[in-house]
Regions:
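Charged, low-complexity intrinsically disordered segments
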Residues: 1-150
Length: 150
């Protein structure tokens, strides 16, 4: 029995539900491994060899190598786990979040200090707000392939 996931209509947002958790399990476990110094050093010395030890999909591995956080999230990555990948590369969470929105770190900071994105035009997929896919670097609605039928 499938759940009716009304939240797939929230633009620019991936809800980390049970399905996403299952899809990204190995990706997220890889990220958790980076909490250990020895694992971070092994990863930094030969990224491909280290990620090949993990049973991730090739798309997940490529997202890690590209440090493409939007892609990693679309493949089941959880931002709190992915933060360990960013930290391994010397990035702050603010830098990571900015990169996910197509903004510089300072543009992102200023937006957040100003109260974040407006909800106007961003309540459901298909409006014309700044969180809509056509305004984002990833260019596709989150969950586009899973979007519920109206």
């Amino acid at each position: 029995m499938s759940l009716n996931k009304n939240y797939l209509d929230v633009p620019g947002t991936t809800i980390f539900d049970a399905d996403e958790s299952r899809k990204g399990y190995h990706l997220n476990q890889f990220c958790m491994s980076l909490m250990k110094h020895d694992n971070r050093e092994r990863f930094k010395s030969d990224q491909r060899a280290y990620i090949d030890e993990w049973p991730m999909t090739e798309a997940q591995k490529q997202a890690v190598l590209d440090v493409d956080l939007n892609r990693a999230i679309s493949l089941g990555g959880n931002i709190y786990f992915l933060a360990k990948l960013g930290a391994t590369h010397g990035k702050s969470f603010q830098q990571m979040a900015g990169s996910m929105t197509g903004m510089t770190e300072m543009e992102y900071r200023d937006m957040m200090i100003g109260g974040g994105r407006s909800v106007e035009g961003n309540r459901v997929v298909g409006e014309n707000g700044t969180a809509q896919a056509h305004h984002q670097p990833q260019g596709q609605p989150q969950g586009a392939s899973n979007k519920r039928a109206k």
